[in-house]
């Protein structure tokens, strides 16, 4: 991203090109809910695959799991979500607007608060600082009430025998409760990790900022189990691995990221160390990726309530202990939003022409190639090339409009390479390939069209 862009520009661009659609649009939509269109679905899957390759598939001690969205409600009792997973809400008596009390304080004062700060302290800070309603500018507040963020539902077919259950607010707990199963069936010794990609649900009071904060979202989480004495080293290793993934693999600009290592007084109750990666979104710097040392908190909590041992036996020392856990956690949509913002650019080509270009790495791009016949008379040859390419690469076919307009369309959706089929192609079996970022062109044999080979050719041509 060459300059700061506003959210409206980003949203309009990705809606217009089929990355996202407003959820339930024909029924006037559902607030802050989005469906991923054809291009958004492709790039989302590409992102998940890159995460899996970097964090899971490339390491022998890493395992993948896919747990249920609905778990026994005792899971959420043990984890503390039923009692503590809530936002402090406060209402303006004048205009009836509702806000998170902690957000009001953070946005209007320099007071230091955290998730352990009680309601009495929060209301005193609001009163002492005479914080006004952002909507009507009055200062007439209700008491603070706690609002649990979990969606509840019921299972069972008979009304008076239905059981209360919850849609999971995070994927982590499904990993914790399967710790023993994974360790036993995979014959795994410490240290080892378990990753999961899956849906989570939070009844957010203030969702918004496009796909940054929604009530339904996907998480990519890892719980890495280790001996407590090894946890600092494991933590630092994940810290470097996340940096490598963001800056080397995804090519996100480092100047758009802040890395915050929180002091102990600002840590969550379960964490002994937390580092957040903040991205410079259109609405400001906000959390992109979290890395936490959760210690023995989760396994101990589940062991205590379930009365089942979640201890690990060191076969060499015969010592039994509850493992420590290091957790890197990122939201798929949030990371995707950062990638799209970072890749979006508006360029001036000459005095009369501009272009919007999405400078995605080829591994993320929805399509790697676009096949563009110069004339309808070349469709048969172009379709032959397309059909061969589709077997090994995701590609698209575009025969509508001038070649210049087709180039611009592919630039705007992030296609790295356009393959132009011209009349000479019928004679020499060669095509012209255009590079998205440099707009340079090279001519190669059809049989030589391969993503890695094309990348190398343009690299050497620069």
UniProtKB/Swiss-Prot annotation:
Keywords: Aminoacyl-tRNA synthetase, ATP-binding, Cytoplasm, Ligase, Nucleotide-binding, Protein biosynthesis. It catalyses: tRNA(Gly) + glycine + ATP = glycyl-tRNA(Gly) + AMP + diphosphate. ATP binds at residues 202-204, 212-217, 287-288, 331-334. Substrate binds at residues 100, 170, 217-221, 327-331. One of its GO terms (biological process) is glycyl-tRNA aminoacylation. It holds the Pfam family tRNA-synt_2b. It is an enzyme of class 6 (ligase). GO terms for molecular function: ATP binding; glycine-tRNA ligase activity; protein dimerization activity. One of its GO terms (cellular component) is cytoplasm. Its EC number is 6.1.1.14. It comes from the Bacteria. It is found in: Cytoplasm. Catalyzes the attachment of glycine to tRNA(Gly). Belongs to the class-II aminoacyl-tRNA synthetase family. Homodimer. This is Glycine--tRNA ligase. The gene is glyQS.
């Amino acid at each position: 991203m060459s300059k700061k862009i506003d959210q409206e520009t980003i949203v309009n661009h990705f809606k217009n090109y089929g990355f996202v659609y407003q959820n339930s649009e024909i029924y006037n939509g559902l607030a802050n809910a989005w469906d991923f269109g054809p291009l958004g679905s492709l790039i989302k899957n590409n992102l998940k695959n890159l995460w899996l390759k970097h964090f899971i598939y490339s390491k022998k001690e890493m395992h993948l799991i896919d747990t249920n969205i609905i778990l026994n409600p005792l899971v959420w009792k043990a984890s503390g979500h039923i009692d503590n997973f809530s936002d402090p809400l406060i209402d303006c008596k004048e205009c009836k607007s509702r806000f998170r009390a902690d957000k009001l304080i953070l946005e209007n004062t320099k007071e230091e608060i955290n998730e352990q700060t009680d309601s009495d302290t929060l209301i005193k800070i609001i009163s002492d600082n005479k914080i006004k309603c952002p909507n009507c500018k009055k200062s007439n507040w209700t008491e603070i009430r706690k609002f649990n963020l979990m969606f509840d539902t019921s299972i069972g077919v008979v009304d008076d025998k239905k059981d209360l259950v919850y849609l999971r607010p995070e994927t982590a707990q499904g990993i914790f409760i399967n710790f023993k199963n994974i360790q036993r069936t995979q014959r795994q010794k410490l240290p080892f990790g378990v990753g999961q990609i899956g849906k989570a649900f939070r009844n957010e009071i203030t969702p918004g900022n496009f796909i940054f904060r929604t009530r339904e979202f996907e998480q990519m989480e890892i719980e890495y189990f280790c001996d407590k004495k090894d946890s600092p080293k494991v933590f630092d290793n994940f810290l470097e691995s996340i940096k490598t993934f963001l800056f080397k693999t995804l090519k996100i600009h480092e100047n758009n990221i802040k890395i915050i290592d929180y002091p102990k007084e600002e840590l969550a109750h379960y964490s002994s160390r937390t580092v957040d990666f903040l991205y410079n979104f259109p609405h400001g710097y906000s959390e992109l990726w979290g890395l936490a040392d959760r210690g023995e908190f989760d396994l101990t909590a589940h062991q205590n309530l379930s009365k089942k041992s979640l201890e690990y036996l060191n076969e060499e020392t015969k010592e039994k202990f509850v493992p420590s856990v290091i957790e890197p956690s990122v939201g798929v949509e949030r990371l995707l939003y950062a990638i799209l913002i970072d890749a979006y650019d508006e360029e001036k080509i000459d005095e009369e022409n501009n272009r919007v270009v999405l400078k995605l790495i080829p591994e993320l791009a929805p399509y790697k190639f676009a096949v563009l016949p110069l004339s309808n008379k070349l469709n048969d040859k172009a379709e032959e090339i397309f059909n061969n390419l589709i077997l090994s690469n995701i590609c698209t076919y575009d025969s509508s409009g001038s070649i210049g307009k087709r180039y611009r369309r592919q630039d705007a959706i992030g296609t790295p390479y356009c393959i132009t089929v011209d009349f000479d192609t019928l004679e020499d079996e060669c095509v012209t390939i255009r590079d998205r970022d440099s707009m340079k062109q090279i001519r190669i044999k059809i049989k030589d069209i391969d993503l890695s080979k094309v990348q190398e050719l343009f690299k050497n041509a620069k």
